[in-house]
Amino acid sequence: MINFHAKRAENKVSRKAHAIINNNFCPLGHLNMLNIQQFIRDHVTGRQQSMFLPDIQANTTKLTQEIKNKKVLVIGGAGSIGSSYIKAVLPFRPAQLIVIDLSENGLAELTRDLRSTEGMYIPADFRTYTLNFADSIFERLFRENGGFDIVANFSAHKHVRSEKDKYSVQALLENNVIKAKRLLDLLTEIPPQHFFCVSTDKAANPVNIMGASKRVMEDLIMAYSDRFPVTTARFANVAFSNGSLPASWLDRLSKKQPLVAPTDVKRYFVSPEESGQICMLACMLGKSGEIFFPKLKEGQMKTFSSICDDFIMAMGYEKKNFDTDAEARRFASEMPADSKLYPVVYSKSDTTGEKSYEEFFVEGEKIDIQRFTSLGIIEEVKIRPYAEVDKFLEELQTLFCRADFTKADVVEALKHFLPTFEHEEKGKNLDQKM
């Protein structure tokens, strides 16, 4: 019998929590008791077990059939979602696992994590490589390996802050779309049995360039759905994932810096474990061309400020509100190590690209909510002709070759391709805030 829990050994203290304890500033001595996973269950998702566990258990035979003794490639596997996907897949005993990521340190930690987890199955052929999947060395690896049965791509720009100027916008679209096409073209040489590429809820009625890039990515992979099976998933924020606002609170505590959060931005949340499971279910059980999403109710959305309130209490503090960043920084720099108050700055969102709410599907998309207990599916997705998508990508690359192109030019090009894209430029980005 597959042990779904053996793949996840819960450290009582997160790696970042250890860093805080070892720092000169140890908040009240309470942090060494922090269990991040339990905090997520109690205060973020409100679920004591994964919402996807019933569907995994109900489909164990099928999942085993699709994964056991197969060759698996995970691109961007050192990140939060990619590593969680790996932990979800390994109990089904693939014959080979190759992980690609640009983060050498991340791959080292992934390997240590897997090999330090009690009960974790690791195939004899397990390899990690620090390289770009758009490089020629990756193409050589792919061909000499004889391709892969399962390919999952988690390499992406995921932050709304990635649209601050023309350079960041070009990098975002190069990575999320143009390089993704290069990968898809390579896969046509030795087609996989399953191809999965992660999307985002922000692809539904996008209001920022990151979300728009993911919507284009969806159109792109669907254009290949007649060449090999492709699926994707739009899902919620991953609680305390790398680079997320909640994860940054741990860093701020370690450096004795204020905590910040928007009061008017509501988000759905899944745990890191759940993020990998939804991707595995979509990848292995989906029909080509389908888009998956978690069946979460509107009432389950939470504001970051409410989560921050609970986090501060869990750390043994009382929050002290400040109206300005400067006031909060000053208080933080002067507060004693045994302070029972901790500075926070809560404010309404005022930066470009922030969407006040989340949605997984839009009007006109055909939804199936019966097939799985925890997952909804957008089926019969309208597939844009390959030539149409390819033409748009060529137009983007031509635009990027112009020395005088602007961010506004890119927005207009995206609006032409995505009529539902409603971008509002506010002249302020997240890099200008704490």
Which ranges hold each PLM region?
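Short, low-complexity, charge-dense intrinsically disordered segments
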Residues: 7-13
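Non-catalytic terminal and boundary segments that flank Rossmann-like NAD(P)-dependent oxidoreductase
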Residues: 21-71, 419-433
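Strand-loop microenvironment adjacent to phosphate/nucleotide-handling motifs in alpha/beta enzyme folds
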Residues: 62, 221-434
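N-terminal Rossmann NAD(P)H-binding glycine-rich loop of SDR-like oxidoreductase domains
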Residues: 75-78, 83-89
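NAD(P)H-binding glycine-rich loop region in Rossmannoid oxidoreductase-like domains
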Residues: 88-99, 115, 122, 131-174, ...
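Conserved glycine-rich Rossmann-like NAD(P)H-binding loop of the short-chain dehydrogenase/reductase
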Residues: 95-109
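Conserved Rossmann-fold NAD(P)-dependent oxidoreductase catalytic core, especially the SDR/UDP-sugar
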Residues: 153, 157-174, 178-215, 223
